[in-house]
Amino acid sequence: MTEAEAEVKASARPKNPVTVIGISGPSSSGKTTLARLLQRIFSHISENLQTFIMHEDDFYLPDDRIPYTTTSSGKTVQDWDTVEAIDVPFMASALSYVRQHGRLPPRLKSKEDLNEASDSGVSDETIAQLQRQVSEKLQQVGPVLVGDGEKRTVVFFEGFLLFSPPEAEVREHVLRPVHEQIDVRLFLPAPYDYVKNRRERRSGYVTIGPAPVPPLPHRGSSASDDVKQHVDLEAEDDAPPQNFWTDPPGYVDDIVWPRYVRDHAWLLLPESGLDNDRYQNARNSDIDELVRIVGQGTNVRTDAGVAVAPGKGALPMADVLKWAIEEVMKPLEMAER
């Protein structure tokens, strides 16, 4: 490539481009851990590369607006694992703001780091080695990210409900405005037994707290609202003081796992050897049958526009991290060519 061609190519790049990496999967599958590891890897590569994390948990509705549901055993509990508990319009607007400005909106103050952080399972030596490998690879691809040039932003956006089915299969979906703003979609499957064990060992979660009275008109709306409310993203966060949620007994089997299977029925496949026709029928009606057919929930489609982590949830986090780095590198390498 001549110097003139390189200048033309550089001028064609978007100013301060933003790449959003979506990381999703069931509860306790390692989403937050992976996001933090990727942040550590990529945040020290170059002054021209800015990185930060977004957490879907920061978009929960206030505690007193979380919907209630009645379980099969007759218990009435709050359902924190449904899309109706998430302020989807606020989440989509915040994501749009990030893509436009390359930073989090002032309104968004994260509470996720107040939750307990578990050991990542990846040594400092491995992280340092991966940092060197990423830096060397980017140097081979082009000078923009490692030398003088325009800044690029990479956002690691993690959450349990980020993706939507292919538009050819489901024309309208509540998460489509979020899904379409994510450039790289990573999915971490995890078996039911693992999810249940990890989730039930957690002490609980920091929550947003109850809504102010009267409710503020610009801080959120439920996913089912007919009219999308305006969200002033430049305003300071006016969320109330945090509360703390602890799962009641049986919450994984009553709420967490059935909701995960229901909301990802478009992505999950029947457990090996089970009837696919029965699965397709159950997707539209019987959640108990759907959960039974999915089994451990580690068979996942690879043709739905989502990159699925190898190993069906059984690989060490170090191996998942290496896979994720390769996926993150793809758009960065393409941008430099």
What are these regions (language model features)?
Residues V206-Y279:
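Acidic, metal/cofactor-coordinating or nucleic-acid-engaging core segments within structured domains
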Residues K31:
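Conserved lysine of the Walker
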Residues A10-P17, A128-T153, Q229-T246, G250, ...:
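Intrinsically disordered, low-complexity acidic Ser/Thr-rich regulatory segments
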Residues Q131-P212:
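ATP-dependent NMP and nucleoside kinases share a basic, alpha-helical "lid"
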Residues F52-H55, F59-D124:
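Conserved nucleotide-sensing/catalytic segment adjacent to the nucleotide-binding pocket
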Residues M1-G22, P26, L37, S43-F52:
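Extreme N-terminal, non-catalytic leader segments
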Residues S110-E150, F163-P166, R171, L175, ...:
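Conformational switch/transducer regions in large eukaryotic molecular machines and scaffolds
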Residues T2-A12, I41, R202-Y205, Y251-R337:
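NTP-dependent small-molecule kinase module
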